[in-house]
Amino acid sequence: MFRSLVRKTTPLLAFGVGIAAFPKDWRKGQFGDKKLLVINDSVLEQIRSTDRYKQLVNDPNLKHYNSSHAFPDQHHKNYVNTGLLFGPDLMEIDPIVFLDEKNGELTSFYHLGDKLISQDGQIHNGIVSTILDEGLCSAGFPLLPSKKGVTASLSIDFKNQAPPQSTVVLHAKVKEAKGRKVVIEGYLETLPLNKSETPLLIAESKCVLVEPKWFKYFAWLQV
């Protein structure tokens, strides 16, 4: 029994010591002032001119930030929206996020360039899936005990394909929050840039977000 206990506890102990041994700056990075990542200034101005954006930016109950500001610098190159797929004709703006942390509601804006298409010439559904996964999780994180979690399941109902050079908006809302489990629903649609346009529904989604029991130790490890 003693040997069995040692085999089970030694890897966990080594993992914890390994993380704790690294400097705090390496583990968390710096969240100071950062330069906004943007390639397409005209798209950014179009978003800011919409009534929806103006309504959100003037709401004192919402946290307003850009996607790249939500995580340490050393992780940028591995993050899809502002790393792997950020560039000319790809993701051309740093996604703009408005988050109601208390009620678990999120609205975020993206621009999808010409190089994000599939063989049919429309935006690849993998891009849509990534936006939905990351966005719905961001809405649910604040309602978890440690504010961290992993996707347990993600279901997506694709309605229409987004054309290239689309500006899209994600709407997400927590439907259930109980202990270490949060259920979020949301949808992605195109953003009308003038009153004569109507939004095109791209996809609807449901995400189950859970916090593993051992995530609570991240708090004192400062990860």
Curated annotation (Swiss-Prot):
Signal peptide: none
Keyword Transit peptide (UniProt): yes
CDD domains named in the record: PaaI_thioesterase
GO cellular component: mitochondrion
Pfam family for this entry, one: 4HBT
Transit peptide limits: 1-12
InterPro entries reported for this sequence: HotDog_dom_sf, PTE-AB_protein, Thioestr_dom
Designated name of the protein: Uncharacterized protein CAWG_04269, mitochondrial
Native organism: Candida albicans (strain WO-1)
